[in-house]
Structures are given as C-alpha cells and as structure tokens.
C-alpha cells in the first residue's frame, strides 16, 4: 500500500485541495462527463452544463468523501463502507467509473498544483486513488 512518505505527500498536497473542494470536484466531474460521456447515464436528472449547481454540489460531495479517505488512509474500507454500499446496492454504478473519475481527478490536481504535483506526488495519489476505487468496488464481488 502507501509508504509513510507517500502518505505525507498526499496529506501535504491535500492542504491545497481542501480549500477548493467544490471547484476541484466539479472540474473533475465535468472532465469525466466530457471525456467519458457514457458516465452521464448515472446523472440523467442533473443539469450537466458547465458550472451547474448540481455538479458543483456533487463535486463537493466527491471531494469531501476523498478527504475522509485521506484522513483514514490506514482503514479505507471502514471509512468508505457506506459510500461503497450506496454505489453498489442503491445506485448500481459500474465500478469502472471510479477509475475514470480518478483519472480526471489526477488531471485536476496536476493543473492546479503545477510543479508541486511532482512525479512522487503523482505516484502517491495514483496508489491512493486506486485503493479508493478498489474499496468502492469491493461490494460488487
């Protein structure tokens, strides 16, 4: 899993994410809807236009959930259990979408963190987001 150094890199970078939760989350969702239009099917009831209040609110929910995971990196299963249940049993989201959103979140991080999104930070976040995606997909097995 994540080394102690990688966890520190994630926590340090998260300090910048924390102050822009709604913006980063909305941008990641908008990117996902643009690059992977098939993901829109789960949001048929949303206004999917740029800057939509629904996308901004949901984007913030996504980033708040990631923040919970950031602060519970040693026990992601417990931290994300309810969210995993919701997506598997109620929303029935195809688990591949977690990986698609993770990729879009990487792009958002790289764009906003600039040089601070070093190769080491990228690797740490890649491992972290892959672990989050795996935990969210646990209930599908």
Swiss-Prot record:
Keywords: Heme, Iron, Metal-binding, Oxygen transport, Transport. Residues 1-141 form the Globin domain. GO terms for biological process: hydrogen peroxide catabolic process. CDD domains: Hb-alpha-like. Red blood cells. Involved in oxygen transport from the lung to the various peripheral tissues. This is Hemoglobin subunit alpha-D. The gene is HBAD.
């Amino acid at each position: 899993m994540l080394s102690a150094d990688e966890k520190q890199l994630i926590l340090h970078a998260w300090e910048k994410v924390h102050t822009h939760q709604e913006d980063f989350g909305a941008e990641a969702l908008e990117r996902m809807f643009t690059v992977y239009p098939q993901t829109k099917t789960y949001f048929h009831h949303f206004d999917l236009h740029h800057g939509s209040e629904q996308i901004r609110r949901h984007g913030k929910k996504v980033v708040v959930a990631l923040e919970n995971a950031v602060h519970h990196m040693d026990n992601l299963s417990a931290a994300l259990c309810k969210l995993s249940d919701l997506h598997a049993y109620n929303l029935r989201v195809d688990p591949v979408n977690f990986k698609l959103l993770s990729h879009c979140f990487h792009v958002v991080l790289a764009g906003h963190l600039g040089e601070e999104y070093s190769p080491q930070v990228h690797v740490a976040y890649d491992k972290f987001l892959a672990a989050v995606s795996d935990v969210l997909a646990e209930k599908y097995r």
